[in-house]
Amino acid sequence: MLRTLPFLLLLTFIGNSVSAQDRCTAHTLTQRFLNEQGLSTDIGRALDKLPAGQLKAGGSLTVPVAVHVVWNISAENVPDATIIDMIATMNEDYQGLNPDFGTVRATFTGAQGVPNITFCLAQIDPNGNATTGITRTQTSDTWFDPDLETNDMKSAPSGIAPWDPDSYLNIWICDIASGLGGGLITTGYAYLPVGGMVGSNIDGIVIDYNYGLDAGARTA
């Protein structure tokens, strides 16, 4: 379950902060990476093999979140308060508490529901130590080109490796837009991984520190 969350959560971030045109950019980037790595077919086969119970899990789920802030200049080193607000927005959306929950388009009313997923910043790190759930890594990269440096923020020397994706939802916050010079901007991306599949080391969500975080306007 935890491994399917990054891709689903990306829809929340994108819905909150960007236009439909930008959503297409993120989808194109994600699909291209999966095709280049030969993962698209693997994902389809793996999902086909999942029992129905895993796709429609009942009950509730609490997901520990590890937020990795990878920054070059101080403006990119987003404060704890912004991250806490981001987690609150995620919980509103996934518990049906967002203000416009009742205004969903008629096309989707039949599929609307509350998945009973709660997100919280991790309190224990992979080594068993107490943590705030937030890591901060200063990088020499002025920004990460989403076309050429898609996953550079997820490992040294440019960034930081994910915490165990079977136990945590990893979110990287960094600059993936400032060098694009206008036009279409990729504000975030994620992949749809399945446990044991090649590529699990890049599980998680990447969002832009500026365009991908919209702490002041919660609309979904």
Tell me what each language-model feature is:
Residues 21-60, 94:
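N-terminal zymogen propeptides
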Residues 17-18, 77, 102:
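Short linear functional motifs in flexible/disordered or boundary regions
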